[in-house]
């Protein structure tokens, strides 16, 4: 398909092949939107954005190698003219707050009608912000994330099953420092251990 001169150039990032294909097919039905690349992980998405400089990146929030949140934060600095829309199956207020803090211009649930995604692409391209209304209301009333960025990094890895030794090596910290951060996170969340703390934080959208 040949893109019209005024077409909005979009890159899609989604690790589920069927969902990726469906999103691409739906957006390609729009006469003013062209999908110029499809990627299955965050690193490939970042590479594609760097190479193709799209108008809009539509990305899943949970991605291998680099999450949608990490992508949005990176692009805000390195490619400010590419606007990010995050799609998610998780109606968690904490995710929305983190997405907006990362610089995402749109945040939608995957179960919304296809026409809403196309409209969101257009509005974000014009410089507007698009947020699912129900999620916006929940986020306004939700409790604030008490975790620091470092606590979040460490707790996420602990929740994935990494040991303190592995986390320390990966983040270039001492094991004692890792344990201190974990203790702080556990206390803030009122959890019984690191696994429980990670579960609580994920439920609230803080990881």
Regions found by a protein language model. Give the residues of each.
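Receiver (REC) domain active-site loop signature in two-component systems and cognate sites
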Residues: 63
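Short, flexible helix-to-coil linker/hinge segments that flank and couple to helix-turn-helix
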Residues: 94-153, 206
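Short hydrophobic/Thr-rich beta-strand motif most characteristic of the beta2 strand and flanking loop
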Residues: 32-40, 48, 191
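Active-site residues of response regulator receiver
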Residues: 60, 88
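Acidic catalytic/metal-coordinating carboxylates
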Residues: 41-44, 67-71
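Active-site beta3 strand of CheY-like receiver
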Residues: 52-58
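Recognition helix of helix-turn-helix DNA-binding domains
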Residues: 163-196
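Conserved acidic segment of CheY-like receiver
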Residues: 6-19, 23-27
């Amino acid at each position: 398909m040949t893109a019209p001169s005024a077409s909005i150039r979009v890159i899609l990032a989604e690790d589920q092949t069927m969902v990726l294909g469906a999103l691409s097919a739906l957006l390609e039905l729009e006469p003013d939107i062209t999908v110029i690349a499809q990627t299955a992980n965050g690193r490939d998405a970042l590479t594609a954005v760097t190479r193709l400089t799209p108008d809009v990146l539509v990305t899943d929030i949970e991605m291998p190698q680099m999450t949608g949140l990490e992508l949005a934060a990176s692009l805000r600095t390195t490619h400010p003219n590419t606007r990010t829309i995050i799609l998610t199956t998780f109606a968690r207020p904490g995710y929305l707050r983190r997405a907006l803090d990362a610089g995402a211009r749109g945040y939608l649930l995957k179960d919304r009608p296809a026409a809403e995604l196309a409209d969101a692409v257009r509005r974000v391209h014009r410089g507007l912000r698009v947020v699912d209304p129900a999620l916006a209301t929940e986020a306004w009333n939700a409790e604030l994330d008490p975790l620091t960025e470092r606590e979040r990094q460490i707790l996420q890895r602990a929740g994935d099953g990494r040991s303190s030794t592995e986390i320390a090596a990966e983040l270039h910290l001492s094991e004692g420092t890792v344990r201190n951060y974990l203790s702080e996170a556990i206390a803030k969340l009122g959890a019984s251990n690191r696994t429980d703390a990670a579960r609580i934080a994920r439920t609230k959208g803080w990881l």
